[in-house]
Amino acid sequence: MSPQTETKASVGFKAGVKDYKLTYYTPEYQTLDTDILAAFRVTPQPGVPPEEAGAAVAAESSTGTWTTVWTDGLTSLDRYKGRCYHIDPVPGEENQYICYVAYPLDLFEEGSVTNMFTSIVGNVFGFKALRALRLEDLRIPVAYIKTFQGPPHGIQVERDKLNKYGRPLLGCTIKPKLGLSAKNYGRAVYECLRGGLDFTKDDENVNSQPFMRWRDRFLFCAEALYKAQAETGEIKGHYLNATAGTCEEMIKRAVFARELGVPIVMHDYLTGGFTANTSLAHYCRDNGLLLHIHRAMHAVIDRQKNHGMHFRVLAKALRLSGGDHIHAGTVVGKLEGERDITLGFVDLLRDDYTEIDANRGIYFTQSWVSTPGVLPVASGGIHVWHMPALTEIFGDDSVLQFGGGTLGHPWGNAPGAVANRVALEACVQARNEGRDLAREGNTIIREASKWSPELAAACEVWKEIKFEFPAVDTLDKDKKKG
């Protein structure tokens, strides 16, 4: 009898409740290349041993339930069950453990992030035996990755479409995010693109409200885009937010964007949902549209260090589901993002292969084989003084987005865009000449401002602006050792 059809019916059924660890804690297990591996930060309730807690996570996120059931005998649990195969205490934390769980690939539907998350981060997060639970990382096997399309186009194809190489791309979120009429919104888009930006962007909550319906916005933004392209000779884009209340409406908006001939649309992938996002990504590849992804709602899931899901997992899920850009924090701006951890998931988005690296919070070696990379987007509270640090931290394959840092310029939108473009070009040139952006950044910006009155005005406005709050999401360190 094959392992796939072997059952335990002949063993006999014994009703009752037994410890999870008797079945689901298997420290001797050797993981397979086809297993999905998960690293959970587990905080058990007092009196619950870590082995029982880890086994409970493995059980409740795979084949287990709270009591023995006679139908267990109708299948092969050894083939299908999740296994907690290793447990490490968290340095510097009492009663916290990293529990490693292996899931057989047959537990998951091909090409479905929705199904993968329903299993791995489903009911188990409300389990009473656990005080808190956080999914820190996943290892997605190549066999499963190949069932996904992934990003519609990827980094190289985007650069070829835009004909822009050797520098980060520049963007701007139109502000105020809500309340503008479609015509005034389009005017702001035109001024920013004419001033030197590559992209402008709908904010995440701009959908189709009474003050600005989506079709009107799309039309005025397309007009602005084409006018700016004609004046500058550069290819321009505006992230038209196709997020909607239904998948059908979302696709209708993407179809209209394609008919207008614009290069890129946008989706809020967490609030919109992974099923909708994957559908839109497939449409974008088939129709030549780039796809910008906003991560609205991510901090509800990933902000707390002991419960929820780390953003590196959400980033991996996005690369599977599909997106050409995704917001990834700034390190230096107003939003949460510690440098080493941020660079860890930035590499997961862009690179074909990443190694285990405890210093950057990466728990598993990950190969993406032929899956295209995703451009990380730095956005939130950044301005011209941040440009050297952003260029040094994120490198060329990134999008740097200045919303208030463009539209807040004292001379207007177009001068704000000019200031950012001059600052970026100065930083890229200085880097290419071998200068140290981390040490000489302020000097480089001051030198460039002598030749650009727009940049000089921006430097003066934002010279005192800082966001100096400690990051919540930091690496684990032994507090006793300091």
Swiss-Prot record:
Gene that encodes it: rbcL
Residue ranges listed under propeptide: 1-2
Active site: K175 (proton acceptor), H294 (proton acceptor)
Record-listed Mg(2+) binding positions: K201, D203, E204
PTMs per UniProt: The disulfide bond which can form in the large chain dimeric partners within the hexadecamer appears to be associated with oxidative stress and protein turnover.
HAMAP family: RuBisCO_L_type1
Modified residues (N-acetylproline): P3
Marked site (Transition state stabilizer) residue numbers: K334
Reaction(s) the record says it catalyses: 2 (2R)-3-phosphoglycerate + 2 H(+) = D-ribulose 1,5-bisphosphate + CO2 + H2O; D-ribulose 1,5-bisphosphate + O2 = 2-phosphoglycolate + (2R)-3-phosphoglycerate + 2 H(+)
Family: Belongs to the RuBisCO large chain family. Type I subfamily.
Any one GO biological process: photorespiration
Major localization listed first in the record, in broad terms: plastid
N6-carboxylysine, modified sites: K201
Binding site for substrate: N123, T173, K177, R295, H327, S379
EC number: 4.1.1.39
GO molecular function: magnesium ion binding; monooxygenase activity; ribulose-bisphosphate carboxylase activity
Keywords: Acetylation, Calvin cycle, Carbon dioxide fixation, Chloroplast, Disulfide bond, Lyase, Magnesium, Metal-binding, Methylation, Monooxygenase, Oxidoreductase, Photorespiration, Photosynthesis, Plastid
Highest taxon in the source lineage: Eukaryota
Modified residues (N6,N6,N6-trimethyllysine): K14
Assembly and interaction partners: Heterohexadecamer of 8 large chains and 8 small chains; disulfide-linked. The disulfide link is formed within the large subunit homodimers.
Note: The basic functional RuBisCO is composed of a large chain homodimer in a 'head-to-tail' conformation. In form I RuBisCO this homodimer is arranged in a barrel-like tetramer with the small subunits forming a tetrameric 'cap' on each end of the 'barrel'.
Stated name of the protein: Ribulose bisphosphate carboxylase large chain
Xref: Gene3D superfamilies: Ribulose bisphosphate carboxylase, large subunit, C-terminal domain, RuBisCO large subunit, N-terminal domain
Co-factor(s): Mg(2+)
Location within or outside the cell: Plastid, Chloroplast
